[in-house]
Amino acid sequence: MSSRTKFLLFVLMAAALLPCIAATAESEDSAAVPASPAAVNPVAEVRNARSWEYGPFVNWGKGVGDRSDFDFLWGGIQLAKPLTPVLHAGIFSGQFEYGGNIMPLWLAFTPAAHEQTFLYGGTAYTQPIGGGTYVGLSLTPVIFRWNFLTQSRHFQPWFQAAGGLVYTTHKFPPDVLVPHGTDGGTSVWNFSPQGGVGVHYFLRSRRSIDLGVNAVHISSASLGDRNPGVNASVQIQVGYTFWK
């Protein structure tokens, strides 16, 4: 396992523990303070009101494994709303939330186009491979999120599972180049199933900064003649949320 892959796995594990650490860090302080009005407890305020939430975010990501030389930069707007009251299930108590996002900024930075030598039937041959910067946009219409019940007045941890669609102006990911209009290559349409964890940190009433880490898979589901995909990438997300 390369040092880069180990670093990405460390970041993912650290982010997964962050919500628990944050909630624990504030639990003692919260326990010492009498029940507060919603105005001074931003987390309880939006939880009880089941408030709509919306805001901008930006993602920076890195491919894993055989895609470790892929980098990603995405940006967009997210909209969501809790659909249930608090559901009690021990340490898993929390609220179910449904949301979606759109990313008009979708960039993938891959190695430059080059020629690659293949061995087939004992014979070596060379073919051109695409590459460079890929531009597109993405829509994630399904985000299922679980907001954990917390006593903290500032931290709201969560985990989520989601599914989206990606369109790129050129077939992605790069593969063996074929003449335009002929069969072969990958697809301009890809799917992006994903899952991750994160936390809202409330700066004040109805305003939070957000940090999340997602593991994202990108695949065309064989819409193209070839489907090498991006089996795994780690995406770090930073955002700002307004609650209404």
Language model features by range: what are they?
Residues 1-46:
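Cleavable N-terminal export/targeting peptides
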Residues 62-65, 125-132, 177-185, 221-228:
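Extracellular loop and loop/strand-boundary signature of outer-membrane beta-barrel proteins
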Residues 42-51, 84-96, 149-156, 203-209:
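Short loop/turn motifs that connect adjacent beta-strands in outer-membrane beta-barrel proteins
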Residues 230-244:
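Outer-membrane beta-barrel "beta-signal"
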Residues 54-58, 96-102, 157-163, 195-197, ...:
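Membrane-embedded beta-strand positions of outer-membrane beta-barrel proteins
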Residues 50, 69-75, 133-140, 155, ...:
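Residues that define the transmembrane beta-barrel architecture of outer-membrane proteins
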Residues 58-64, 102-108, 163-171, 215-219, ...:
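Transmembrane beta-strands of outer-membrane beta-barrel pores
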Residues 81, 146-148, 199-201, 240-242:
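Residue-level signature of outer-membrane beta-barrel architecture
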